[in-house]
């Protein structure tokens, strides 16, 4: 992966999705955000805040393109971050009609994919032909609420492709987030 100016797409608008949008807007010029509820999109667009999660966080809307069309978000992004509860991941993924086999996929969910009992990376390989070399996981030890308050926090990003992992990790580092790149995806 030689491209260093990457477009990120976040699928999910809960606490963790909102926190990731906040972090990404610190370092990146363009972030695409899929939110399935039009009323929430309208509120965020008008008020620069998510009405349901981390409502005190002011979002940098000049850097964020919000859409209720998951295919627009996925199609216009190089890196897709899946930040929905695992119980809904299959429902949201089935809405994707564009080919994602060449996209970089980042897992921000916890647990297994319920219908398949697979880890998300295994699920993406089996059902969407995503190469393990284009797959990453992101996790704490921080909480969305700490990110919202800009408390010094730590993230771990893992991938079997360590050079990709380091490239993506740099996109998350900011004054209140330290990032460790790891080759451990489990």
Question: Model-derived features: where do they sit?
Answer:
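A short helix-to-beta-strand connector/capping loop
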Residues: 57-66, 130-134, 175-177
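Conserved Rossmann-fold dehydrogenase catalytic segment
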Residues: 141-148, 175-186
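Short, hinge-like loop/turn segments at secondary-structure boundaries
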Residues: 48-53, 123-124, 152-156
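NAD(P)+-binding Rossmann beta1-loop-alpha1 motif at the extreme N-terminus of oxidoreductases
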Residues: 1-57, 63-68, 74
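Rossmann-like NAD(P)(H) cofactor-binding subdomain of soluble oxidoreductases
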Residues: 70-75, 79-152, 168-169
């Amino acid at each position: 992966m030689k491209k260093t100016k990457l477009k990120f797409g976040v699928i999910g608008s809960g606490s963790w999705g909102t926190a990731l949008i906040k972090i990404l807007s610190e370092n990146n010029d363009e972030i695409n955000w899929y939110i399935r509820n039009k009323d929430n999109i309208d509120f965020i667009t008008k008020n620069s805040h998510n009405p349901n999660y981390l409502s005190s966080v002011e979002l940098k809307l000049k850097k964020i393109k919000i859409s209720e069309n998951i295919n627009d978000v996925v199609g216009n992004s190089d890196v897709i971050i899946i930040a929905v509860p695992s119980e809904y991941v299959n429902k949201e993924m089935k809405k994707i009609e564009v080919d994602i086999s060449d996209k970089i996929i980042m897992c921000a969910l916890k647990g297994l994919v319920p219908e398949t009992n697979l880890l998300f990376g295994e699920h993406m390989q089996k059902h969407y032909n995503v190469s393990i070399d284009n797959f990453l996981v992101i996790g704490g030890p921080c909480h969305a609420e700490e990110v919202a308050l800009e408390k010094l926090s730590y993230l771990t990003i893992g991938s079997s492709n360590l050079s990709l992992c380091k490239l993506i990790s740099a996109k998350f580092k900011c004054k209140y987030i330290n990032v460790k790149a790891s080759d451990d995806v489990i």
